[in-house]
From Swiss-Prot:
Record-listed E.C. numbers: 7.1.1.-
InterPro entries (alphabetical): NAD(P)H_OxRDtase_bac/plastid, NADH_UbQ/plastoQ_OxRdtase_su3, NDAH_ubi_oxred_su3_sf
Protein name (Swiss-Prot/TrEMBL): NAD(P)H-quinone oxidoreductase subunit 3
Family of this protein: Belongs to the complex I subunit 3 family.
Signal sequence, renumbered to the chain: none
Enzyme class: translocase
HAMAP family xref list: NDH1_NuoA (MF_01394)
Record's subcellular location: Cellular thylakoid membrane
Amino acid sequence: MFLLSGYEYFLGFLLIAAAVPILALVTNLIVAPKGRNGERKLTYESGMEPIGGAWIQFNIRYYMFALVFVIFDVETVFLYPWAVAFNRLGLLAFIEALIFIAILVIALAYAWRKGALEWS
């Protein structure tokens, strides 16, 4: 019996997964127009001419909101599998989840107290 007999489907999938992007790039090179005129380099903004410059300075407060969002989004990612398997897990897993949630509540209170959630 051949050693790799169970991997034919995987190898086929791997070849197709490699061939599709290569085929798309080659098709683009063949079909795409070759001209590089000035209109092609212009910015397209919903079919209208862009107004103003694109280089504006964002307020640093957006960074804090994004950071707090990412922290609590990751919390959701970690708590979802726990919630799905809640019936099969024991008391120890429940206590661990409560400790995890308590740490995140403390982090939220800290961010709130430091003013990370205020826009003034």
